[in-house]
C-alpha cells in the first residue's frame, strides 16, 4: 500500500493527519480487522475498548495509533487497509489514491439486496474455486498414487537387483570356498601321496634290508656248513691216524733195524780184512743189488707219494671248488628264489595298487557324477527360483497395473461425480430468486438465533464454512458408490437440499451482519461528516 520503506517516515507522514484521524475514526469498527491482521492482540484491544481511563473516543483512537506505531511497517499497512475498507474518503485524503476495495460503500450504494447478491456471488466463486481445487487435489492424489505405484515398482526392481547382487556375492563366496576346499583337498591328496610314496620307499628299503640280512644269514649258514665239513674231515683224519701201539711196534721195528744195521756195520768193519773172500763179494754184490732195488723202490715210493700228494691236493682243490660251486649254486638258487619272491610281492603290490587305483578312479568318477548331478540339480533349482521370481514380479507388476487402473477409474468416477454436482449446483443457481425469497421467512427465526453465535467465528475464519462444505461434499462423494445403500438420485437430491439450506442460512447470517454493520456505518459516517464539517 505504501511506497515508503522506513517506518519512521511512514508514521511521520500520518502525523500531519493525526487530528483528522482521531476525529473521524471509530476504534470499535477497525479493531476486528486489525486483530485479524495480527497487529493487535486481545490485550491491546481490551485496553483500547474497555479501559475506564479512555472514555473519550478520540483518546481511544490516539492510544490505538500509538499501539500501531509500535508495530512498525506492518501496523502502518494494516491501518491503511482498514481505512481503505471502512473510511474510503479518509483513505483518499491521506494517501491521495483511490481505494481498490469499496466494501463500506456497498450498503450505501446497493442496499442489503445488493450486498446479499455480492455475497452470494463471492460464495459461488469460492465454491467453484473449492471445487476446482478439489478436482486438482483428486488429480494430484491420483498422480501421487501413480507415482507411489511407480515407486513401488522401482523398489521391487531395486530389491530384485539387490537380491540378485546378494545371490551373486553368495555364489562367488561359495565358489571361492569350493576352490579353497578343492585346493586344500588337492594339497592333502598330494601330501598323502607323498607320504604313501615315502612309506613305499621305506617299505622297499626295509624289504631290501630284510633280503640282504636273509642273504647274509644264508651265506653264514653256508660258511658254517663248510666249516662243519672241514671239522668232520679233520675228525676223520684224526680217527684214521695210527694208534699208539702201532707207533710203538713201528718204533721197535725201527730199533731192530737200526741194531741190525749196526751189527752189519760192525760185521762189515770186521770183515774188511776178508773182503777178498768170494763169500764176501757175493754178499756185497747182493747188498748192492738190494740197495739198488731199495733205492728204486724208495724212488718209486717217493714218486708215488708225490703223485698221491698231488692227487690229494688236486682232489682237495676240486673238492673245495665243488663245494664253492655248490655254495654259489645254492646262493644263486636262494637269490633267484628271493628275487622271485620279491618280484611276486612287487607284482602283488602292483595288482593291489592297480585295484586301489581303479577303486579310487571309480569313486572319483562317482563323486564327479554326483557333483555334476548336484550342480545340475542346483542349476535347475536356481532356474526354477528365478522363473518363479520373474513370475512373481510379473504378477506384482500386473497387480500394480491393475491397482493403477483401478485408481484411475476411481479418479474418473470421482471427477464425473464432481462434474455432476457442479452441474446440479449451476442448475440450482440458475433457478429464480423468488423461491429463495419465499423460503427465507421460514428459517428466519432459526437463522437469527444462529447468527449471533456465528458472527465472531465467521470473522475469525471466513473460509471455515467452505471447508466444512468441502468436507461434506467429499464425504458424500466418497460415500457414493456400489456399496452405498441409497440410490444415486436420492443421494443427489439430499445433497442439493443440504447445500441449498446451507446457502440460505449463510445468506441470512451475512445479511443480518451486514445490516448491523450498515447501521453502525451510517451512524459513524454521519458523525464523521459532522466532525468534518466542524473541523473544516
UniProtKB/Swiss-Prot annotation:
The modification Phosphothreonine is found at residues 231, 531, 533. There is a cross-link at residue 125 (Glycyl lysine isopeptide (Lys-Gly) (interchain with G-Cter in ubiquitin)). Residues 6-98 form the CARD domain. Keywords: Adaptive immunity, Coiled coil, Cytoplasm, Immunity, Innate immunity, Isopeptide bond, Metal-binding, Phosphoprotein, Ubl conjugation, Zinc. Zn(2+) binds at residues 3, 10, 73. Residues 425-451, 476-536 are annotated as: Disordered. One of its GO terms (biological process) is positive regulation of innate immune response. Phosphorylated at Thr-231 by PRKCD downstream of C-type lectin receptors activation: phosphorylation promotes interaction with BCL10, followed by activation of NF-kappa-B and MAP kinase p38 pathways. Phosphorylated at Thr-531 and Thr-531 by CK2 following interaction with VHL, leading to inhibit the ability to activate NF-kappa-B. Ubiquitinated at Lys-125 via 'Lys-27'-linked ubiquitin by TRIM62 downstream of C-type lectin receptors activation; leading to CARD9 activation, followed by activation of NF-kappa-B and MAP kinase p38 pathways. Deubiquitinated at Lys-125 by USP15, inhibiting CARD9. Disruption phenotype: Mice were born at the normal Mendelian ratio without obvious anatomical defects but display impaired innate immunity. In response to C.albicans infection, mice develop fungal infections, many of which target the central nervous system (CNS). All mice die within 5 days after infection by C.albicans whereas more than half of the control mice survive for more than 12 days. Impaired zymosan-induced cytokine production. No defects in adaptive immunity. Mice show impaired recruitment of neutrophils in CNS after infection by C.albicans, an immune cell critical for antifungal host defense. Residues 487-502 have a biased composition (Basic and acidic residues). It is found in: Cytoplasm. Monomer. Homodimer; homodimerization is mediated by the CARD domain which forms an extensive interaction with the adjacent linker and coiled-coil regions; leads to an autoinhibited state. Homomultimer; polymerizes following activation, forming a nucleating helical template that seeds BCL10-filament formation via a CARD-CARD interaction. Interacts (via CARD domain) with BCL10 (via CARD domain); interaction takes place following CARD9 activation and polymerization, leading to the formation of a filamentous CBM complex assembly. Adapter protein that plays a key role in innate immune response against fungi by forming signaling complexes downstream of C-type lectin receptors. CARD9-mediated signals are essential for antifungal immunity against a subset of fungi from the phylum Ascomycota. Transduces signals in myeloid cells downstream of C-type lectin receptors CLEC7A (dectin-1), CLEC6A (dectin-2) and CLEC4E (Mincle), which detect pathogen-associated molecular pattern metabolites (PAMPs), such as fungal carbohydrates, and trigger CARD9 activation. This is Caspase recruitment domain-containing protein 9. It comes from Mus musculus (Mouse). The lineage of its organism: Eukaryota, Metazoa, Chordata, Craniata, Vertebrata.
